[in-house]
Amino acid sequence: MTKGKSSPSSGKAPPLKSHGPKRTLQKKVVVVSKEVLRSQLERVNALASNWLTRLGRHKASKKQRVIHSASDCSGHGSDLIAYRLLGLQSQVQPVMMSEVSRQKVLLHQAVAQECGWNYDDHQVIDMFLRKEESMKTADVYVAGYPCPSYSKLGKRQGVSDQRGLLTLKGLEYVALCRPKVVVLEQVKAILEKKHSQIWNYILKILNKLDYVFDHQVLSTQDFAIPQSRPRVYILAVAKEICAGTVKLPEKRSEKVDLHHFIQKDKTGSEVLQLPRYEELLGSKMWRKGYILDVGSSEKFQAAMTNCAPCLTHTRLGQGGYYIPKLRRRLLLEEAGALQGVPKKVVRAMQRAAEEHKLPARTVDASLGDAMSINVLASVLMKGLTHSRLVQFSAQEDHWRLVANGPDAATLSDRLFDGTAWAGPGLK
């Protein structure tokens, strides 16, 4: 018998196949030359040094009728969904977005229309190709840069990788236009010593641009959605219009249980035996993100604490998340809910994918790339309040106040429909 394989009579189950390569983020690395990197660093630094003579300071206003928004590495439009859930679709006007993936641009179009915006008003542009004169000034700038350049699943070349250089291209826009509010997101690995140079550079540029800012690691599970997805967020507000010290939103003290987000009435025919997973992956299998709802096993119930692992582009794109108790894969709407995306938006993305004949699981993969809507909306709420562009009350901090129960799982849907709140309490 060949070593490593078990025969049907051996009593051992054959090993389960891993769904996709383990280190797919290492593909397609384009190394940036030292000259290009030095030139980009110098350009951003120069723009940050002379912003006051070029732009002048923002003027504080009691109420701004239209808020112009721009985003880079826009994906399917997480910022638009967040604005809609905050009830700002009539106040926010998107003016610029960047995205090189044709598939995501098509999904972004569907999301914009579903959220109530005319997609024709968007300026869609490649960050590497846009010219200074083509950049539209915005009040709010949101960017979640590609993670492979910093993630432990990638080669971690930082800004020496072309995808990592997008961080500097985004900072170029910030230095050139100096939006009133800036929201930046990246995997927490950027805080490690290996990437300390670029991290300190980002903070230095924000200081030069006279921003008041805060940075912190926030996870999706900190805001009423049970997914372990730690990300570094930077919230910066122009000093002259900032009301006090900038603080990122407070984390919830109470976690929400995963089972509220799983549709238990839907089961599948894929019989997945948990002991076989235990044998294959070992006692820390839950960290690898292959299964959810591990409450069906006492061993993993305590380890996972009723929380989904980080939903990634690769595994969502390959259907790699299983719910053993229900004998099926994670549904697309469930993945959307665990990212804070309303069902109506997920369905709009599905329709667009079918209409344009996009590859299977395009929507799944896009969800895995995106910022979690609950976290982004909470951060935007703080930024808009600190900048006095919009005033939110404490009772509108939906994700911090919602109870651990079915209401948490449907909160995004109800906010999208405008039915979540009646005065200070949940309907």
What kind of region is each of these model predictions?
Residues 2-64, 392-427:
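Intrinsically disordered, low-complexity glycine/charged-rich regulatory or linker segments
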Residues 33-181, 188-192, 196-200:
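Core alpha/beta nucleotide-donor-binding catalytic domains of modification enzymes
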Residues 51, 276-427:
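C-terminal target-recognition/interaction regions appended to catalytic cores
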Residues 78, 105, 243, 318-320:
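Eukaryotic short linear interaction motifs
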Residues 82, 173, 205, 379-383:
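Alpha-helical recognition domains of nuclear gene-regulatory proteins
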Residues 89, 114, 208, 344, ...:
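Short amphipathic alpha-helical interaction elements and helix-loop-helix interfaces
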Residues 130-140, 148-317, 325-328:
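Class I S-adenosyl-L-methionine
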